[in-house]
C-alpha cells in the first residue's frame, strides 16, 4: 500500500499536506504521531477525519511531506520503499535510488501543493487532476496560516499570501485575518497541557556534524499560559538530553504578539552561544525577532557545529 505521511510530532502543515496530497495521488494519508490541539481544531472545523497512525514503513510505499530529515521520519524508513518527497525545508536524507523530489523555499508545504493545483500542474508529481474541494482547501489554508504564523514569520513569501487568498475563496473564508486568529488561538492553548505534551507538540531532531540536536517550539499568544510550567519543562528537557543522547536541546517559547522567542537551552550551551552570539544567563535567553525554527534557528546552529 502507498501512504503519504508527514514528520513525527506532526503539525497542521504535515497533516493537511498528507491528506490533500493523498487525495490527488489516490493513496492513503497517514501520520507519525498524535494530533495537536491546533490541528484537531482545523480538522473539526472542516469536518475531515484524522489520518491513520502508522509506526512502521516496512512493506509500504512511502511519500514524505513537510520533511526530509531521517531523524524526523520512520525509524525503519529503509524498510519501506521511498517514492517521493514534497517539502519546503532544506534537503535532508539521501537515497540509494532516484526518487521524485519537489520542494520550494516557501512558508509551508501546503503552499507548494496549492501552487501545483492552481497551475494545473499536479500531474508533475504523479497526481490526478481533480477539483479541490472546499474542505481540503480549508486544510491547506489553515496549514499556510499556521506555518507562517499568520504571515508574521520571516519564512513568509508572496506566494504563501497569494495561495492563501485563492484557497480562502474556495473554502468560503471571507476574512483570512479573523480566521487566522482562530487558528493561532487554538495553536496557543497550552494551559491545559502537561509539560511533556507541550514539549512534544512540535519537537524535531537534527544531526549536525554527527551530533544529535533537538529543537522544540511552542507558539503562544499569552506567554503566561506556559510561564508557570517552564521549570518542569526544563527538567524534562534535561532528562531527555541525558537519556536520549542529545548534545544540545533548544526549546523555543515563541511570543506571537511580541514577535520573538525565549530559548530554553539544555546541554551544549557554548555551541548555542557561538551560533547566536549571545550569552545564556541561567537556562534561557530571549531572541528578539526569532519566530522560525527553519529559517532562524536551524541554519546558525548547523553552521556552528560545522565550523
UniProtKB/Swiss-Prot annotation:
Q: Which UniProt keywords apply?
A: Cobalt, Cytoplasm, Hydrolase, Manganese, Metal-binding
Which domain of life, per UniProt? Archaea
Record's catalysed reaction(s):
diphosphate + H2O = 2 phosphate + H(+)
Per the entry, the cofactor note is: Binds 2 manganese ions per subunit.
The record's disulfide annotation reads none
EC number(s) of the enzyme? 3.6.1.1
Where it sits in the cell: the answer is: Cytoplasm
What InterPro entries does UniProt report for this protein, alphabetically? DDH_dom, DHH_sf, DHHA2, DHHA2_dom_sf, Mn-dep_inorganic_PyrPase
User: Which cofactor(s) are needed, names only?
Assistant: Mn(2+)
Q: What class of enzyme is it?
A: hydrolase
GO terms (molecular function) for this protein are: inorganic diphosphate phosphatase activity; manganese ion binding
The positions annotated for binding Mn(2+) 2 are 13, 66, 88, 147
Give the family this protein belongs to, as stated in its UniProt record: Belongs to the PPase class C family.
The protein depicted here goes by the name: Manganese-dependent inorganic pyrophosphatase
Which organism's genome codes for this protein?
Methanocaldococcus jannaschii (strain ATCC 43067 / DSM 2661 / JAL-1 / JCM 10045 / NBRC 100440) (Methanococcus jannaschii)
Name the gene for this chain. Answer: ppaC
Amino acid at each position: 500500500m502507498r501512504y503519504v505521511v508527514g514528520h513525527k510530532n506532526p503539525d497542521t502543515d504535515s497533516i493537511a499536506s498528507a491528506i490533500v496530497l493523498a487525495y490527488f495521488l489516490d493513496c492513503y494519508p497517514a501520520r507519525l504521531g498524535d494530533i495537536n490541539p491546533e490541528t484537531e481544531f482545523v480538522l473539526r472545523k472542516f469536518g475531515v477525519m484524522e489520518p491513520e497512525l502508522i509506526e512502521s514503513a516496512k512493506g509500504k510505499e512511502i511519500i514524505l511531506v513537510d520533511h526530509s530529515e531521517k531523524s524526523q521520519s520512520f525509524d525503519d524508513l529503509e524498510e519501506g520503499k521511498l517514492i517521493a518527497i514534497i517539502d519546503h525545508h532544506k534537503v535532508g536524507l539521501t537515497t540509494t535510488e532516484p526518487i521524485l523530489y519537489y520542494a520550494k523555499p516557501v512558508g509551508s508545504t501546503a503552499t507548494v501543493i496549492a501552487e501545483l493545483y492552481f497551475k494545473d500542474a499536479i500531474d508533475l508529481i504523479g497526481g490526478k487532476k481533480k477539483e479541490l474541494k472546499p474542505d481540503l482547501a480549508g486544510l491547506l489554508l489553515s496549514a499556510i496560516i499556521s506555518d507562517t504564523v499568520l504571515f508574521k514569520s520571516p519564512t513568509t513569501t508572496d506566494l504563501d499570501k497569494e495561495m492563501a487568498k485563492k484557497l480562502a475563496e474556495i473554502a468560503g473564508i471571507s476574512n483570512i485575518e479573523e480566521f487566522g486568529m482562530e487558528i493561532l488561538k487554538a495553536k496557543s492553548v497550552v494551559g491545559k497541557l502537561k509539560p511533556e505534551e507541550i514539549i512534544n507538540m512540535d519537537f524535531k531532531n537534527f544531526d549536525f556534524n554527527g551530533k544529535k540536536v533537538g529543537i522544540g517550539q511552542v507558539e503562544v499568544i499569552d506567554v503566561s499560559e506556559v510561564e508557570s510550567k517552564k521549570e518542569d519543562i526544563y527538567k524534562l528537557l534535561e532528562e531527555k538530553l541525558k537519556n536520549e543522547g542529545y548534545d544540545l536541546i533548544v526549546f523555543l517559547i515563541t511570543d506571537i504578539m511580541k514577535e520573538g522567542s525565549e530559548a530554553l537551552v539544555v546541554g551544549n550551551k557554548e555551541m548555542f552561544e557561538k551560533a547566536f552570539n549571545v550569552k545564556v544567563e541561567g537556562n534561557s535567553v530571549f531572541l528578539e525577532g526569532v519566530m522560525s525554527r527553519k529559517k532562524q534557528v536551524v541554519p546558525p546552529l548547523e553552521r556552528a557545529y560545522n565550523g
